[in-house]
Amino acid sequence: ITPQRLLATHLELVVSSSELHLYTAKENNEYFLIIDCLTRIDLSIFEEKCFSVLLALGLISGNLALNEFFILSFSEEKMSAPLDLMYQTKPSSIYTHQAVFTTNISSISHGMGLSQEEKDRLGVGLTEFPKGVFSELATQLHQHEKLRRATKLLLLGKNASMEMRLPAYYVAIEAITGHVEAKDNLLKPIRDESVAEKLIKSMKELIEVEKKLHSNDDFNSSVLLRKINNLNRPTNKDKLSQPFSFVNYSLSKEEYRILKDRNLYLHGSFTKGKDDNRYRDALHTSTRLSFLVTVLLLKLAGFEGKIINYAKLWSGAIGKNLNEDLILSI
């Protein structure tokens, strides 16, 4: 996959049990992404799977190709003459030009002052994006609405104003958290639900006994009962960090703090003013959040490798002196 130009070499992939081929074609100096299904498939399902493939490619390349679709149907596997043609207008493509993955260090290191030795070191282990992981990523996006939503929020956020970008990234992480929470009891303080129910029941019984000994003003049992009913639910701050444990990614102290700062940005409290330092701090935070959303989406698909560290790439413009590599292993 070559995300820098929104192109792909011919790629065979499997999305939710359907074998698809992804490749490019050029006509009148325009490039088209082509997706073929080699077996009979329902039109609506084909459209869903095609969008999932485009969304997966958009995550990796930073550019989501939409605008317009041409759908051709065929009666035979050779696809020599189409039976029907359908044209669809789509929302505008999203071009962020912020790929998360590269095989060419030189393509992102211009102006960074890296020596050839440093480039060679960073390039160790860089290979093409694994085909199996791409298939799994597209499959996950096809099967799970929360992951599709998170990916779209990530891409839309990259082009949004800072007031919209930061909340979009936090909501993306919340969507992924909801997906992980539905899969696993990892996010609950008490893993065994029967143990939690037993504890909650005993606490409620104790409250019923105690409230008979106190006035309503001195002992507000209704408030206590509401809190006890939520006993086995982590706080929003804690919830956002748990999916990273699920994918075996260790958060740095700064990343953990940024997740804790959710409420500072989620409700649009950040507005651009005259304080350039405040804006630069927010921009730096956005690069960290974008990285974290990417980590979750890729690692849920089984990716192990290196991705671009935009906090470092943009550190000069932001005014941060970061002792970090331009690409990081996840």
Give the positions of each predicted feature.
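Short charge-dense sequence patches
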Residues: I1-L6, S115-L126, L206-H214, N232-S245
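Charged, low-complexity, helix/coiled-coil-prone segments
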Residues: I1, T102-K119, K198-K204, V223-D238
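Polyanionic, low-complexity intrinsically disordered segments
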Residues: K211-I330
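Amphipathic alpha-helical interface elements
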Residues: Q143-R233, I308-A317
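Active-site-adjacent bridging/hinge elements
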Residues: T139-T151, L259-S269
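Short, well-structured alpha-helical interface segments that form or flank functional binding sites
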Residues: E48, R149, S161-V171, S250-K260, ...
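Charged, non-catalytic interaction/linker regions at domain boundaries
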Residues: I1-R149, L156-S161, Y279-D325
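Generic structural signal for bulky hydrophobic/aromatic residues embedded
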Residues: A56, A175-I176, Y265-G268
